[in-house]
Amino acid sequence: MGETAAANNHRHHHHHGHQVFDVASHDFVPPQPAFKCFDDDGRLKRTGTVWTASAHIITAVIGSGVLSLAWAIAQLGWIAGPAVMLLFSLVTLYSSTLLSDCYRTGDAVSGKRNYTYMDAVRSILGGFKFKICGLIQYLNLFGIAIGYTIAASISMMAIKRSNCFHKSGGKDPCHMSSNPYMIVFGVAEILLSQVPDFDQIWWISIVAAVMSFTYSAIGLALGIVQVAANGVFKGSLTGISIGTVTQTQKIWRTFQALGDIAFAYSYSVVLIEIQDTVRSPPAESKTMKKATKISIAVTTIFYMLCGSMGYAAFGDAAPGNLLTGFGFYNPFWLLDIANAAIVVHLVGAYQVFAQPIFAFIEKSVAERYPDNDFLSKEFEIRIPGFKSPYKVNVFRMVYRSGFVVTTTVISMLMPFFNDVVGILGALGFWPLTVYFPVEMYIKQRKVEKWSTRWVCLQMLSVACLVISVVAGVGSIAGVMLDLKVYKPFKSTY
């Protein structure tokens, strides 16, 4: 899900090179003759098709969420695990269908376009809900930055450990602290945070997509190889047995597994941005509905394979993060490639999620203190080899670095990949994937209160709220249990 970059870049590139036509981001659009190269909102003609949209969605979905799926299925077992995944995919499919009707406010063919998820909420549901949606979305982005810091440091350590195991022939347990690796990742992100519009560099999304497919495919392949070597499918129908874990742990872990699976499917936020790259006619929503069906089918099959093979390979001992659980020591170079791919992917994906927060903070501050020199003054520094000087703004430098330091410190305080992923999945799933799309659809299509359709939509929403709450509680309980055993800043693996 980290590769939302793909969608973003595509969108930004519509108008970054063509500042002249960037009228749509303001409120007025001069009347224009129907040129062949522009759309009805004065932006350059969109060229996306069902296939480009599907590709964007697939790259936006398949990401670090894959890594915890085997663990999630291990908590739920062979019956409930795949069933829950199927359920999430169906809910996501349905809510994506509702969302695709919200790209244009009012009329599906000629209504005003909404360029992002937040635009749609603002224009359909109004100011108050827009603020709440923003709060949840920025919290989610902040949480993802923390989750990615943890995941990246775990993968860096995994490379170090696998080489250490290899050297000592498996005799040395190779315990180490994750802190130095989090700090290295943090320093890299502080530097990248200073690059303006980093999330709009076109090749980032391609790199992210290639990397996530690399490590997902390696994880899948190693799972299949391990199953073949074992000669049996491990695991049980009801998941991890009581005895291995206590009764209460089993309940918490089951709840947390729901959050982990929800996280793997949480990408509805980028759907409208992807829809904004699609050409019309036919109506964008039609193309998008096809694309959603294709991409959700592909990702669900892929997730089922990764999760099931991981569980079949390790049974109840399935690691929380498939590639770093050390179920595989050999071929160690292949594991290193997979973990390096994760790190490269997360370094870029961190920025894709952090930059919108930066943009939001900068905009809010500029509106509040328009005349403050400290906030707006830029110093130019000439960098040898670069044509244009680099502009330094003290405020930007200070608070962006502060943001990265905050996420790094929180990661060191609670470096539990699964728990954090579960919390994020729970936080984002109900409001962003279900509640807002349902509310927007009801408002858009003027669904009558207490009509059958209205009641069904509200029941779906309430059911998903319950799942979100349960997953959140389970994950928070997981953090509490982990913190009993773990001393902050002293984590070892």
Swiss-Prot record:
Membrane topology of the entry: Multi-pass membrane protein
Source organism of the structure: Arabidopsis thaliana
Activity regulation: Inhibited by diethylpyrocarbonate (DEPC).
Main location class: membrane
pH dependence: Optimum pH is acidic.
GO BP, sorted A to Z: acidic amino acid transport; amino acid transport; neutral amino acid transport; phloem loading
GO MF: symporter activity
A family per Pfam: Aa_trans
Compartment annotation: Cell membrane
Gene name of this polypeptide: AAP2
CC terms in the record's Gene Ontology section: plasma membrane
Protein name: Amino acid permease 2
